[in-house]
Amino acid sequence: MAKKTLILYYSWSGNTKKLAEKIHDQIEDSDLKAVEVADGTFDDDQYKTNDIALDQIQANSFPDIKLDNVDFNKYDLILIGSPVWSGYPATPIKTLLDQMQGYNGEIASFYTSAGANRKAYVNHFKEWVNDLNVVDVAENDSKIDEWVK
């Protein structure tokens, strides 16, 4: 029997959203929710957004997120999608992970990347989860079948 799965994602340009929707279509009875931030949190320019995110990381001051009230513990598995920004998950993901502390199920992350710092993403994601149970991190949807079994 497949695990009860929630797919959460943050998408700045739309690439991660497309991948999250594809994964949602692959997993029967999964739920899909977007993590959003207030308008003006980031710039329309990719490089300026990257600089804003690095400033947030350095200051340990992460953006507030908008997410419907979610009972994380009703899910066996939560998949978290993010773009890679300078080797880090997008900073709204840090806020999400902080809100998820106490979740007892499994977490896996998928990411979209223009090419650089993929290994750093895995390390930073695992640092940001604290005591949450991360089972895997993968680029795109390559391991979905393994995760939901």
Task: Please report, for each region that a protein language model flagged, where it lies by residue.
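A short helix->loop->beta-strand "cap" motif at the edges of active sites that frequently abuts
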Residues: 102-106
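Glycine-rich, N-terminal phosphate-binding loop of Rossmann-like dinucleotide-binding domains
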Residues: 82-83
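Alpha-helix N-cap/helix-start motif
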Residues: 89-90, 118
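Short alpha-helix in the alpha/beta-hydrolase fold that links the catalytic acid
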Residues: 92-97, 121-124
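Short, glycine-/small-residue-rich phosphate/pyrophosphate-handling segment
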Residues: 108-143
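N-terminal beta1-alpha1-beta2 submodule of the flavodoxin-like/Rossmannoid cofactor-binding fold
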Residues: 1-78, 87-89, 98, 131-134, ...
